[in-house]
């Protein structure tokens, strides 16, 4: 299976594909890996969705979705059918790292979309969409805004806001596990395990460009709370997740 993964990725690199062809190739690779290595059937369920809401101009609104997913998925947002936050990119890198044996790749992902100062142009139908390469689920709500248009403070010079993160993650010991943490803008990233800053020089931890944390060969001692910190010169935002390493069953 590892050779298949490498061959597919090499072919993609050697022969640039259109975005549609690329998505199809990655999707096929995901299904191929998961069909062989997942310990349970793929599943995807929204456990906290959206509700219609009416707010006054100038109010802050936060929309949130929580999703239980096997394998790990991603969440993106749409307004009136147009994507406004996030993407459909799945974590193929972790799958390739774990392609030599069984994987659990299960947990809860949470995502939020923030309207810091509601105005009339924010009226519309909002949708959170979750996908894991096998299924797609969504939750939608209508946001109504009442009142006269107000002048809102610019958010350009603001601290980053965490927009998607892993709330909990289950994975077999000795496998790699990725803890998701994404922000609404470019940010500097730090990660902590319990009360200690993670040492990226140790070789087991890798900070991915997206802000995610990759942990190689997780052990029982890695169980606990992890905190991601996205920061810039204007401030910071934090997310928290819990990692559950599980024992491999020896036949």
From Swiss-Prot:
Source organism of this protein record: Caenorhabditis elegans
Reported tissue expression: Expressed in PVT, AIM and ASI neurons, in vulva and weakly in body wall muscles.
Record has Glycosyltransferase as a keyword: no
Single GO term (MF): cell-cell adhesion mediator activity
Signal peptide feature range: 1-19
CDD domains: Ig
Protein name as it appears in the record: Zwei Ig domain protein zig-3
Domain of life: Eukaryota
Keyword Repeat attached: yes
Disulfide bridge map: 65-128, 181-228
Pfam families: Ig_3
InterPro entries xref list: Ig-like_dom, Ig-like_dom_sf, Ig-like_fold, Ig_sub, Ig_sub2
Primary gene name: zig-3
Function of the protein: Required for maintaining axon position of PVQ and PVP neurons postembryonically in the ventral nerve cord (VNC) by preventing axons drifting into the opposite side of the VNC that could occur during body growth and movement.
Residue ranges of domain Ig-like C2-type in the record: 42-144, 160-244
GO BP annotations, alphabetical order: axon guidance; dendrite self-avoidance; homophilic cell adhesion via plasma membrane adhesion molecules
Cellular compartment(s): Secreted
Disruption phenotype: At the L1 larval stage, display defects in the positioning of the ventral nerve cord (VNC) axons characterized by axons of PVQ and PVP neurons, but not of RMEV, HSN and AVK neurons, drifting into the opposite VNC side (axon flip-over). These defects are not enhanced in a zig-4 (gk34) mutant background or in zig-4 (gk34) dig-1 (ky188), zig-4 (gk34) sax-7 (nj48) or zig-4 (gk34) egl-15 (n484) mutant background. In a zig-1, zig-2, zig-4 or zig-5 or zig-8 mutant background, cell body positioning of ASI and ASH head neurons is normal.
Keywords per UniProt: Disulfide bond, Immunoglobulin domain, Repeat, Secreted, Signal
A cellular component annotation (GO) from this entry: extracellular region
């Amino acid at each position: 299976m590892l050779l298949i993964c490498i061959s597919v990725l090499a072919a993609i690199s050697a022969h640039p594909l259109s975005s549609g062809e690329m998505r199809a190739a990655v999707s096929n690779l995901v299904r191929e890996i998961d069909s062989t290595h997942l310990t349970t059937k793929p599943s995807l369920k929204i456990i906290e969705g959206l509700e219609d809401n009416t707010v006054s101009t100038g109010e802050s609104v936060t929309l949130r979705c929580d999703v239980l997913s096997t394998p790990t998925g991603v969440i993106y947002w749409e307004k009136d059918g147009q994507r406004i936050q996030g993407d459909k990119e799945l974590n193929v890198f972790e799958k390739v790292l774990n392609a030599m044996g069984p994987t659990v790749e299960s947990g809860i992902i949470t995502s939020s979309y923030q309207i810091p100062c509601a105005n009339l142009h924010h009226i519309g139908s909002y949708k959170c969409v979750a996908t894991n390469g096998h299924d797609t689920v969504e939750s939608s709500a209508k946001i109504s805004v009442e009142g006269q248009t107000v002048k809102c403070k610019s958010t350009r010079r603001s601290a980053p806001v965490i927009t998607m993160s892993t709330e909990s993650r289950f994975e077999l010991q000795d496998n790699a596990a990725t803890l998701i943490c994404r922000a609404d803008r470019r940010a500097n990233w730090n990660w902590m395990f319990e009360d200690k800053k993670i040492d990226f020089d140790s070789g087991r931890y890798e900070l991915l460009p997206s802000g995610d944390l990759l942990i190689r060969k997780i052990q029982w001692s890695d169980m606990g709370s992890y905190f991601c910190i996205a920061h810039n010169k204007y401030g910071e935002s934090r997310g928290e997740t819990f990692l559950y390493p599980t024992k491999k069953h020896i036949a």
